[in-house]
């Protein structure tokens, strides 16, 4: 192919990774752990927890889609078949104020984690509730395939904003992401 240089520079160019991301990806593939500062370890642990919480939310939404004939009919009507639903991990957030919260927010630490990922909101009285309700859910993946945010499309025309996206978080910066890029790169 005519490429030259190191494995790190190859990953930086081919996968458009930053230097540290390329080093971490190569280490992960080789089964080697990259040493980090203790302060960094605490931050990395929180980020890993956020990735895990978002992945758990995506799985919950996929199960809820399997249980919702109405949501599947909506997607069928839009030409989104079962193969594409699976390929893009499309799901459904049930119509309830605490479905996600009850399923994944099992203690105070997990509730705070779900708030940091933008999956829960808090009203003026301090009541915490699911941000996404009665919406087809589109997980947004980073370039490494990790779920970092969601876009939700309302099923009923008059039920709030047509599209609702995750807020910017430590993992998600809207201007830096392109929906579906990870899936296209897998093809």
Task: Please describe what each predicted stretch is.
Residues 1-116, 127, 135, 150, ...:
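Non-catalytic accessory segments of DNA primases and related replication-initiation nucleases
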Residues 130:
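Aromatic- and glycine-enriched glycan-recognition loops and surfaces
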């Amino acid at each position: 192919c005519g490429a030259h240089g190191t494995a790190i520079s190859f990953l930086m160019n081919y996968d458009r990774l930053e230097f540290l991301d390329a080093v971490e990806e190569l280490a992960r593939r080789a089964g080697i752990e990259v040493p980090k500062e203790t302060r960094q370890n605490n931050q990395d642990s929180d980020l890993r927890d956020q990735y895990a919480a978002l992945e758990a939310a995506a799985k919950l939404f996929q199960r809820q889609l399997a249980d919702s004939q109405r949501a599947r009919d909506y997607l069928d009507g839009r030409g989104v078949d079962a193969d594409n639903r699976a390929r893009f991990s499309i799901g459904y957030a049930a119509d309830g104020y605490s479905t996600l919260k009850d399923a994944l927010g099992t203690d105070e630490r997990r509730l705070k984690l779900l708030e940091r990922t933008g999956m829960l909101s808090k009203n003026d009285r301090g009541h915490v509730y699911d941000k996404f309700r009665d919406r087809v859910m589109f997980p947004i993946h980073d370039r490494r395939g990790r779920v970092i945010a969601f876009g939700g499309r309302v099923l009923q025309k008059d039920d709030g904003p047509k599209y609702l996206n995750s807020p910017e978080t430590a993992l998600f910066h809207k201007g830096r992401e392109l929906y579906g890029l990870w899936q296209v790169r897998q093809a």
